[in-house]
Amino acid sequence: MLTSGNILLAGSLLSPEPGLIFWTTITFVLVLIILKKIAWGPIISALEEREKGIQSSIDRAHGAKEESEAILRQNRELLAKADAEADRVIREGREYAEKIRAEITEKAHQESQKMISAAKEEIEQEKRRALAELRNEVADLAVRGAEKIIRGVLDADVQKKVVDSMIQDLSTNRN
């Protein structure tokens, strides 16, 4: 209906009528009862099941987190142990190398001392042999000189010549 440019709606849903309110309330209650009997149980059980699934996922996530933290701690401990072991091995290696170096140095020192001692002994033996040889030659020269002196009377010039000749003989025999 149209009056003076306004539209009036008769029997509109927005106008409160007692019959409409009554039937709407009854329909609402019936729908609630039907939903409670038919759909409410499955919806609630689905929500509970979903809640259990979410809780289970959360529990598994917490368990996985704790497990990963335990593994991380264990890995850190193993890494610390490995570092300590590596440090120990390096330290022992250095100590062993130092010990070997000291032993080699000591052996080299002992060998050099042996060689020096052997060389000194050899020099001493050569010196003794040379002195013995020199004594023998001097004794031979003295005997020969005495022989020549005994054979004849010598004057100073002759004695000088004899001594010079013995020295020359000595130097020729040594070479």
Curated annotation (Swiss-Prot):
It comes from Chlorobium luteolum (strain DSM 273 / BCRC 81028 / 2530). It is found in: Cell inner membrane. This is ATP synthase subunit b 2. One of its GO terms (cellular component) is proton-transporting ATP synthase complex. Belongs to the ATPase B chain family. PANTHER family: ATP SYNTHASE SUBUNIT B, ATP SYNTHASE SUBUNIT B', CHLOROPLASTIC. The gene is atpF2. The chain crosses the membrane at residues 20-40. F(1)F(0) ATP synthase produces ATP from ADP in the presence of a proton or sodium gradient. F-type ATPases consist of two structural domains, F(1) containing the extramembraneous catalytic core and F(0) containing the membrane proton channel, linked together by a central stalk and a peripheral stalk. During catalysis, ATP synthesis in the catalytic domain of F(1) is coupled via a rotary mechanism of the central stalk subunits to proton translocation. The keyword Transmembrane applies. One of its GO terms (molecular function) is proton-transporting ATP synthase activity, rotational mechanism. F-type ATPases have 2 components, F(1) - the catalytic core - and F(0) - the membrane proton channel. F(1) has five subunits: alpha(3), beta(3), gamma(1), delta(1), epsilon(1). F(0) has four main subunits: a(1), b(2) and c(10-14). The alpha and beta chains form an alternating ring which encloses part of the gamma chain. F(1) is attached to F(0) by a central stalk formed by the gamma and epsilon chains, while a peripheral stalk is formed by the delta and b chains. Its main location: membrane. It is a single-pass membrane protein. InterPro entries: ATP_synth_B-like_membr_sf (IPR028987), ATP_synth_b/b'su_bac/chlpt (IPR002146), ATP_synth_F0_bsu_bac (IPR005864), ATP_synthase_B_chain (IPR050059). Keywords: ATP synthesis, Cell inner membrane, Cell membrane, CF(0), Hydrogen ion transport, Ion transport, Membrane, Transmembrane, Transmembrane helix, Transport.
